[in-house]
Amino acid sequence: DGPITSPESADAPIRALYLCANRFVLLNEHPFPVRIAWRVLGTDEHGEQTLKAAPAGAAEFSEVEISVQQAGALAVYRGDELLVVRENARTACEPTVGRPSLSLAGSETVGEWSVAKPWPIVAVHLHLLLDGKVLAWGKFGDPQVWNPASDTFTPYSVGSNLFCAGHAMTATGQRSSRGGHISDAHGLPDANSFNPKTSTWTSLPPMARGRWYPTVTELPTGQLVVVGGKDQNGVTVKIPEVWNGTSWRALTGASRTLPYYPRNFLAPNGKIFDAGEEKTTRYLGTGGSGGWSKVGDRLYGVRDYGAAVMYLPGKILYVGGGRTTATAETIDLNVAGPTWQWTGSMAYPRRHLNATLLPTGEVLVTGGTSGTSFNETSMGVHVAEVWNPATGVWTQLASNAVNRGYHATSILLPDGRVLHTGSGDAIDENGNPYPDERNGELFSPPYLFRGARPTITSAPAEPSYGATITVKTPVPAAIAKAGLIAIGSATHAFDSNQRFMWLTFTRTSTAVSVKLPTSRIQAPPGYYMLFILDGNDVPSVGRIMRLH
C-alpha cells in the first residue's frame, strides 16, 4: 500500500516524500552530492536541484524541500534514469482553525521554569523509575540515575552503548533497552535490562540483528515487540521481533521498511498501531508470523521528528514535525473505520519537540526548532504550549532558557513537574557539533500555582486489574477527578511508554474508592502514577503503583 508508483522504496538512496499542498521533500543518502532533475507529470513544470551529501552524523541523509506550482505527481530523475514518482495527495498544510494568543498573566496561568542545572551527560534517553528517580543516558559516558530530592547523580555502567536504542518498561518495572550504537546508522543486537530495585544491569539474549532507532512497545501479555531500526551493516531491519521474557520470535509475515523510531502504540484491538512518521498509518498484528494492515492516511504528510501521544485510551495526538509544521491531528481507534481529524494548531511550528501527558489530561509541548533544515538550532522554540483535548485549543505558557532540539527529552515527574533536558550529542551536515546541553530544566505547570494540593496519604502499592482501591485523602469531598499515567520513557521526540486514562471513583468520609482498569490492552501491566485532582484541576503528588 502507499502512493509510490515507481520501484522506489524506503531503502533507496534518493527518495521523495510528499508533505502537503504542492510541497515535497527530497532525501539523499549518498555520501556525495547528487544532481537531479524533477518534473510535475502532466504539466510542463520542471527544474533541477543539487542534493547535498548525506551528513556523517545526525540524520544520515540530506534533505531539501521543493514547492511546485502544479498539482501533479512529482517525478525525479538522475540523468535519463527515473528514480521515483511521488503522488500529490493534495492535502492542506493547515487546518481551518485559529491559533492561540500569548497570555501575559502570572505563574498560575503560564507556569514557571527553573534555572538550568548541570547534568553529567546529554540526556538523549530519559526514563522515570519506580521510586521517582530518573535514569538517563546519551552517546557518551555511563548511564546516570538522577535523584530529584537531592539533585545528585549516580553512574551505573553497562556493557553496551545504549545510544539510539529503543526501550520500554516491563511488567515488573525493569527498564528494558533493545539495540544500541556501533556508529551512526549501525546498530547493536544487544538486549539489556535495568533493575531499579537493585540498580543493576542485566544482559539478555540478543536479537537476530542489530537495531539503531527501533521502537519497543509492551503487549497486553507483558511481552515486548521491537520494530524498525538499522542493523550492524546499516541495513534496515524489516522483520519485527517479539520478546517473551526468555527468547525472541520473529514476525516473518510482517516485513516492512519503516522510518526511524516508528510512533507505535498498543491499540484497543490488541494490535500495534503505527501512527508515523510516514503519512500512511497501519496496524501490526503480532500473532503467529504477524502481518500489517492499512488503517488510513494522516491529513498532513511526513511528520518526521514530530511527537505523538495516546492522550486517552485509543485516542492519539500527532503534532508538529515535517518541514516544519505547527499543525496537529488526532485519531480515535475505538471507532469502526477510524480517520485522522484536524485539531488546533500550535502557535509555533516545531520539530524535535517533546509531548508530555499531564495529570490534568492535557498535553504539554516543549522545545524543538521551527527551522526547515534537520536541526536548525538558530530557530529554537522556547515557549511551552499545552493542548486541551476537550476543546482542541493550544495555550502558550512560559518560556524556558535553553535551546533544546535534536536529542532533547522530557518526562513527567510524580510531583507534577516536567523535566526537560538533553539536546546535542550529534553533528550537523557540515561536520560541526551541535551544542551539547548537559543540563536540565524543570517546568512547573500552572496547576502548581492554584492553591493547596490534594494529598494521598495511603494507597495500595501493587493492586490488581479491576480492583476498587481505597485511596485515603484528608478531604475526600474536594476530589473531583482521578487519573492514571504510565511512567515515561522518552527519546527522539517520542515517549513510547506514557498513556493516560481517567478513572471512576466514589467518596467516603475518609477516602475515595477508585476503580482500576480491567483491560490489559487499555493499561498494559506495569507501573503507573495515580493522581487525584480537586475542582480546580490541581493534582496531588502522583502515587506510583504496580498494576498486575
Residue ranges of each PLM-predicted region?
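Edge beta-strands of extracellular beta-sandwich domains
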Residues: 2, 80-98, 539-546
